[in-house]
């Protein structure tokens, strides 16, 4: 029995609250059960130097955890004077995932920065960040159209992510912290709304997993992501 009585293929309740803050062009509070992340999308005119003159835009991301988002307090990385390797890995993942959602040529020379700040962590903070940031990005892009900066919205479709893993020999979807910490296999999967894979991060924490188990986990992830995308679209329709 899973901690919340969920079936193995069931994601936690997902909530997406749009326009959560007033200054950013897009802002979303995303909740996967007890994991809560504030995602904002900020638009700037211009692109990084390596893209100047190429007529395309750029999407980048930053990720951080509030000191008491976890069971015990972690010092802010700013106080330590440098970002940790995990932080850099996750923010690059978020940016790669969201670039797959946008036609960067159609975006033109704008840069959109996605800031994902974890308010409370209970497993799956990177997958929640991608899911929430995609909705914040959609709102920001629509603002560019409404303000006459773009003729058409360059969003190609939704992108979402979910964790899957093997715990006590069983494949499960959307791991909470207690499940994640006990997982024999831990995997994060990012997909487009039509089920194409953007990224798979999978690690055998204990026993190596088989090819068949990999396919089972990917199928679980696709089912979970279909449910999450439906929630994203419902949030954007309101």
From Swiss-Prot:
GO terms for molecular function: 3'-5'-RNA exonuclease activity; tRNA binding; tRNA nucleotidyltransferase activity. It comes from Shigella flexneri. Phosphorolytic 3'-5' exoribonuclease that plays an important role in tRNA 3'-end maturation. Removes nucleotide residues following the 3'-CCA terminus of tRNAs; can also add nucleotides to the ends of RNA molecules by using nucleoside diphosphates as substrates, but this may not be physiologically important. Probably plays a role in initiation of 16S rRNA degradation (leading to ribosome degradation) during starvation. Homohexameric ring arranged as a trimer of dimers. Belongs to the RNase PH family. Phosphate binds at residues 86, 124-126. One of its GO terms (biological process) is rRNA processing. Keywords: Nucleotidyltransferase, RNA-binding, rRNA processing, Transferase, tRNA processing, tRNA-binding. This is Ribonuclease PH. Pfam families: RNase_PH, RNase_PH_C. InterPro entries: ExoRNase_PH_dom1, ExoRNase_PH_dom2, ExoRNase_PH_dom2_sf, PNPase/RNase_PH_dom_sf, Ribosomal_Su5_D2-typ_SF, RNase_PH, RNase_PH_bac-type, RNase_PH_CS. It catalyses: tRNA(n+1) + phosphate = tRNA(n) + a ribonucleoside 5'-diphosphate. It comes from the Bacteria. Its EC number is 2.7.7.56.
């Amino acid at each position: 029995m899973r901690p919340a009585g969920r079936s193995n293929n069931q994601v936690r309740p997902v909530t997406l609250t749009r326009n959560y803050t007033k200054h950013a062009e897009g802002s979303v509070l995303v909740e996967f059960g007890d994991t809560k992340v504030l995602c904002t999308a900020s638009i700037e005119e211009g692109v990084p130097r390596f893209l100047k003159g190429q007529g395309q835009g750029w999407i980048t991301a930053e990720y951080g955890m509030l000191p008491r988002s976890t069971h015990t307090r972690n010092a802010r990385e700013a106080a330590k004077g440098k970002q940790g390797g995990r932080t850099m890995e996750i923010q690059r993942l978020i940016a790669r995932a969201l670039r797959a959602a946008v036609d960067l040529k159609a975006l033109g020379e704008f840069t959109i920065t996605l800031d994902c700040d974890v308010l409370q962590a209970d497993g799956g903070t990177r997958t929640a960040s991608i899911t929430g940031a995609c909705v914040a990005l959609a709102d920001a892009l629509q603002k560019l159209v409404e303000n006459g900066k773009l003729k058409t919205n360059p969003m190609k479709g939704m992108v979402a992510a979910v964790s899957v893993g093997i715990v006590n020999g069983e494949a499960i979807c959307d791991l909470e912290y207690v499940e994640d910490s006990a997982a024999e296999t831990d995997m994060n999967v990012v997909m487009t709304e039509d089920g194409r894979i953007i990224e798979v991060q999978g690690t055998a924490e204990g026993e190596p997993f088989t090819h068949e188990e990999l396919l089972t986990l990917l199928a679980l992830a696709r089912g979970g992501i279909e449910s999450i995308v439906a929630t994203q679209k419902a949030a954007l329709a309101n």
